[in-house]
Amino acid sequence: MDEDLMERMKGVCRVKFYVTDDADGKAQLARWLEGIDKPYTTASLGDNDWAHSWQKYYKPMTVGEKLWIVPEWERDQTPPEGRTPVYLNPGLTFGTGNHASTQLCLMGLEEYVVPGAPVLDLGCGSGILSIAAMALGASSAVAVDIDPKAVDVAYENAGLNGIGRDRYTVRAGDVLTDQALVKELGGQRYPLVLANIVADVIMPLSA
């Protein structure tokens, strides 16, 4: 690990986690706190607080030279001149466009997407990368995520951008262990593979 990063990680840390507000959640909290002699506070969240409160901070953003990432609830705004809109409702999956690694991937798409050719998106989350790739000219995309929730979210986001299932296939599974999934993905060649995921997954795939 990078020494500068390790140095920045030193000091006081605050850890937040969430449990259900019932007997099981309280028992889980008690187990986690065993042997920890540190101050802590608890607070109850309303059913919709955690699921929707973030939306007020998620605003349209320009990325690179061509893309305009737009939350679904702000799609009535007019795209800036020369920008290709990508409409999203990421829900609880990764992929809003705010994260630096996502933005770097989006900027890379502008340079590396092959018009009329398919892309493979590993760790698709909300589908932002593969959907943006098709908005920039890719013919189709196959997307995979280990989180089953990502399948519906990615399909819904594709629909927001006028992309149907004839062009977009989303699967849930682990590409390192699911041999049936690996076989399915291996049935086609992709000029561009998108993988905004941790190195521990990318390295075995590239071997």
Language model regions located:
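Glycine-rich, N-terminal phosphate-binding loop of Rossmann-like dinucleotide-binding domains
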Residues: I197
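Proteins enriched for Cys/Gly/acidic motifs involved in redox and nucleic-acid/cofactor modification
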Residues: P60-V86, P90-A100, L106
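A short acidic, Gly/Pro-enriched loop at the edge of an enzyme's catalytic core
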Residues: A180-L192
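Short loop/turn elements that flank and shape the SAM/SAH-binding pocket of Class I
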Residues: R75-D76, L176-L181
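A short, conserved alpha-helix within the catalytic core of class I
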Residues: D200-A207
